[in-house]
């Protein structure tokens, strides 16, 4: 099948720091207006999962977490803060093992170290969990953007990831919600 795609253009939208309870769609709308960008049919928004999760109040203060026996043992084994290990246990579907500083987990259908918990994009002493239901988050954001701009759009929630047995980071798509026709070529 011949592709109609001639080019891809990407625009970075600078936003203020997303805080717990912020409305990501309202922020996007304001920043798009400021940048004089009007989304068109078929445009796809790529959002960092840490920003979406933060807006959904998925930021946890570690001091409020009391680790259980399993978290204490696994935290020692994997050299992780036992409070963070407690959150890993609560958030993940399965722990496969680990190495120093990383427990290998399946969380919300993704292979992710430490259940995708992110300390790098959180205030000191806090961590950001993955969105509660990332697919629903992507769908909700997409529907609101489509309603606002009266065209079919896509939303991808992704973030940087480290991968087992690989050096460096990748930027995989974690969750999508598209109403656009796609062709696998």
Task: Please give the residue ranges for each predicted region.
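N-terminal and secondary-structure boundary signal
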Residues: 1-178
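Single conserved hydrophobic/aromatic residue that forms the stacking wall/gate
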Residues: 177-185
């Amino acid at each position: 099948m011949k592709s109609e795609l001639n080019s891809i253009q990407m625009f970075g939208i600078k936003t203020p720091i997303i805080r717990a309870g912020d409305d990501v769609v309202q922020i996007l709308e304001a920043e798009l207006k400021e940048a004089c960008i009007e989304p068109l049919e078929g445009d796809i928004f790529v959002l960092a999962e840490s920003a979406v999760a933060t807006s959904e109040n998925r930021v946890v203060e570690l001091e409020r977490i009391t680790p259980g026996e399993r978290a204490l043992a696994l935290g020692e084994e994997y050299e992780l803060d036992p409070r963070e290990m407690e959150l890993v246990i609560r958030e993940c579907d399965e722990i496969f093992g680990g190495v120093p500083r990383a427990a290998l987990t399946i969380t919300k259908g993704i292979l992710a170290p430490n259940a995708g918990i992110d300390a790098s994009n959180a205030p000191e002493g806090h961590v950001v969990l993955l969105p509660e239901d990332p697919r629903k988050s992507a769908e909700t954001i997409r529907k609101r953007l489509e309603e606002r701009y009266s065209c079919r759009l896509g939303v991808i929630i992704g973030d940087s990831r480290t991968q087992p047995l690989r050096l460096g980071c990748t930027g995989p798509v974690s969750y999508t919600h598209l109403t656009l026709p796609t062709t696998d070529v």
